[in-house]
Structure formats: structure tokens, C-alpha cells
A protein has these predicted regions:
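Membrane-embedded beta-strand positions of outer-membrane beta-barrel proteins
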Residues: 2-6, 60-63, 108, 127, ...
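Outer-membrane beta-barrel channels and translocator barrels
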Residues: 53-55, 101-104, 132-134
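Transmembrane beta-strand segments that form the barrel wall of outer-membrane beta-barrel proteins
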Residues: 103-116
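Outer-membrane beta-barrel translocator domains and adjoining extracellular loop/strand segments
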Residues: 14-21, 71-79, 119-125, 150-158
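Residues that define the transmembrane beta-barrel architecture of outer-membrane proteins
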Residues: 38-44, 87-93, 119-123, 171-175
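Residues on the lipid-exposed face of transmembrane beta-strands in outer-membrane beta-barrel proteins
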Residues: 1, 46-50, 93-99, 125-129, ...
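Outer-membrane beta-barrel translocator/channel fold
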Residues: 134-176
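Structural signature of outer-membrane beta-barrel domains
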Residues: 7-14, 65-70, 113-117, 144-148
Length: 176
């Protein structure tokens, strides 16, 4: 059978002050400070699932992850417009597998990005054993490689020291 998952999400962050606060450093404007960020994310996953008695349930999929992280402010430093947006689409392929054998339940998932900068490799696995109808023992492991959160890569503020663009400086984080 074929499966499809579509998810769209918008996030919004705003910081405002009537007057600059010396504690935060030098401000680019003296009053009505306003930092506004928006993040639009869309996941579009499509794939096929096959379930066989001896092999378990297997789902093979392709995923498109579109993101648009941006600030509405435009800052010029030395006459050069500073970057204010990270926008792209990451494409990946993956596999999910689940099998029950006696009281054991085994689940594995893997996904690999082959186009894009933000996502990378993800591997997850769990093994559980049902002790009885209400209790089970479970153990799992996860390996994940991806870029840090968007706000580590790009931020714009009315405060001088809170403006950065590091997309090209960072490498993917490896999380276990």
C-alpha cells in the first residue's frame, strides 16, 4: 500500500523594546527595537509499505523537507546587504522496518539526505520484550547527523553583537 505524509508548520519569534538596553550592548537604533523571525517548514513524505509474515512490515520512502528561515529586517554593513534568510529544500530517502517475534518487538529506521544542507543521516533502532500485557522492557539507540538549529546559523537584531550568519562555517552535528 502507498502512504503519504504532508506536514506544514510556521514558527514566529518577536523581541521588542521601547528603548535600547546597555546590558545587551550597542544598539543600531535608539528606540522601538524590534527583532522578528519566521520559520516555515514543510515535510512531504511519500512511500510504499509492504507487510509479509516472515519479513515484517517495511516502509520505503522519499522525503522533501522545505524550509524558509528569515528575518524581515534588512541590514547594510559597509554598504553590503547582510544575509537575512536560509531557504532550501533537502531531499532524502529512508526505510522503516518493524517485526514481532514471540514476545520481542524490533524496530529500525534509517534516512539519508542526498541533496541539501540542513539534514543528514539518521539511524534509530529499538528492541523491546513484553513481560506481560502491561509491562515491557525496551532499549534503543539513535545516531543523528544534522546542522544546528537555525538560530545558531543566522540571527539579526537591532543590537550590534546579535547579528550573525554561520551557515557556511558550521558542519553537521553528530548526536548519539
Amino acid at each position: 500500500r502507498f502512504r503519504h505524509l504532508f506536514m506544514y508548520e510556521t514558527e514566529y519569534y518577536a523581541f521588542s523594546e521601547r528603548a535600547a538596553n546597555a546590558y545587551l550592548g550597542t544598539a543600531l537604533v535608539s528606540s522601538s527595537l524590534s527583532d522578528k523571525m519566521r520559520l516555515q517548514k514543510m515535510h512531504n513524505r511519500v512511500g510504499a509499505e509492504l507487510e509479509l509474515p516472515y519479513l515484517g512490515r517495511t516502509f520505503v520512502f522519499g522525503n522533501a523537507y522545505h524550509y524558509n528561515y528569515y528575518f524581515r529586517n534588512a541590514y547594510y554593513v559597509g554598504g553590503v546587504l547582510q544575509r537575512h534568510q536560509i531557504k532550501d529544500t533537502d531531499l532524502s530517502v529512508g526505510l522503516q522496518w518493524h517485526k514481532k517475534v514471540g514476545g520481542f518487538s524490533i524496530t529500525a529506521e534509517g534516512e539519508q539526505t542526498f541533496v541539501g544542507k540542513m539534514t543528514g543521516t539518521q539511524l534509530k533502532g529499538t528492541l523491546s520484550y513484553a513481560l506481560d500485557a502491561q509491562n515491557k522492557l525496551s532499549a534503543g539507540a539513535m545516531l543523528h547527523s544534522a546542522m544546528p538549529n537555525f538560530n545558531y546559523l543566522l540571527y539579526q537584531s537591532d543590537y550590534k553583537n546579535y547579528n550573525w550568519y554561520h551557515l557556511d562555517d558550521f558542519s553537521k552535528e553528530n548526536i548519539q
